[in-house]
Amino acid sequence: MYELIKKDGLAKRGRLHTVHGVIETPVFMNVGTAAAIKGAVATTDLQEIKTQVELSNTYHLHVRPGDEVVKKLGGLHKFMNWDKPILTDSGGFQVFSLAGLRRIKEEGVYFNSHIDGHKIFMGPEESMRIQSNLASTIAMAFDECPSSVADREYIEKSVARTTRWLVRCKKEMERLNSLPDTINKHQMLFGINQGGVYEDIRIKHADEISKLNLDGYAVGGLAVGESHEEMYRILDAVVPHLPDHKPTYLMGVGTPVNILEAVDRGVDFFDCVYPSRNGRHGHVYTNHGKLNLFNAKFELDDRPIEEGCQCPACRNYSRAYIRHLLKAKEMLGMRLCVLHNLYFYNTMMEEIRDALDAGNFASYKEEKLYRMGQSSIKNV
């Protein structure tokens, strides 16, 4: 159950009650594609860096180790040793982005594994069964994420099919949650809004899927090539057409600036690989912008990545030492940068929630953007 605690403008301060605990929103979900966050981050680290939700990938876990294996081992929570909420995406994005040759039919998608090339079929029912085997807290509906360069006619057909698939996802989820051997009989289902950069298609789709009374709603198919201004324009158009009393999830986004702008538009769930991916390459976030620790100017810098930061890296090590580890290709350097970045993101979400509680999100946002050397583009 989602509890809308208060609003500050369009920004939502919420709380999602789940079988695996309460999620305070707005929240950034830490991405662990194959049931682990890249960068040698263990689930035992997640508590220390303020993680509320871990996100894993249905497609990757279906291919390896196999969702049946995970089910036999008690589900993802037991498999990973993580007792807080987990969201699994449906596999749709990976099917349409990673897979080479694929055939889209009404029943689903036929494609080849990116690992060994073997043939796989995935449709709405298959995606729900896989996610039920994984026993995640929140399952995402199976959708088509069309190319950012697809024409309007194709987008319209794709969105209509995604709507039909969503109805099938809901029916299958209800069936699975009633089975005696299902691990998580309270698995939630989020639907996904699509429509490319076409506002009218997006709005019509949002209105249609809102009638299905799902546990939450996501905006998908953004951050796939369009400009930030286009993304914000779409959010301005579509978010008001999604239920206010349900979580609103912007998939795969994004930078700290993206998150601040999207919160201002009513979004309260986020995920993105940026903090871990950038960390693995020595790029770290601070309240004054991003640093590249490979830069020679940090060779003798004995300060932490950010003064006052309480992450494991900043409490114990200097920029100079972490730079040395990165240059020496020691895994510890990568790990420390990833831990710092995730802590930075999770702390920023904590600050956002505090600002919403206090009713001063607008001033917090402007100050945060100013310190990071950015400016608001709320009114693009």
Question: What does each of the following model-derived ranges do?
Answer:
Residues 1-183, 296-299:
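Non-catalytic, usually N-terminal nucleic-acid engagement modules in DNA/RNA processing proteins
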Residues 178-185, 374-380:
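Short, basic, low-complexity termini and linkers enriched in Ser/Thr/Gly/Pro
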Residues 126, 130, 157-168, 204, ...:
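A non-catalytic, amphipathic alpha-helix used as a structural packing/dimerization or gating element
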Residues 163, 172, 176, 184, ...:
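Glycine-rich phosphate/ribose-binding loops and adjacent secondary-structure elements
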Residues 21, 54, 89, 131, ...:
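Conserved, mostly hydrophobic/aromatic
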Residues 1-15, 23-32, 39-40, 143-149, ...:
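C-terminal extensions of enzymes
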Residues 147-151, 156, 216-222, 331-334:
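Glycine- and acidic
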Residues 30, 60-62, 93-94, 146-147, ...:
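Short, solvent-exposed loop/turn segments at secondary-structure junctions
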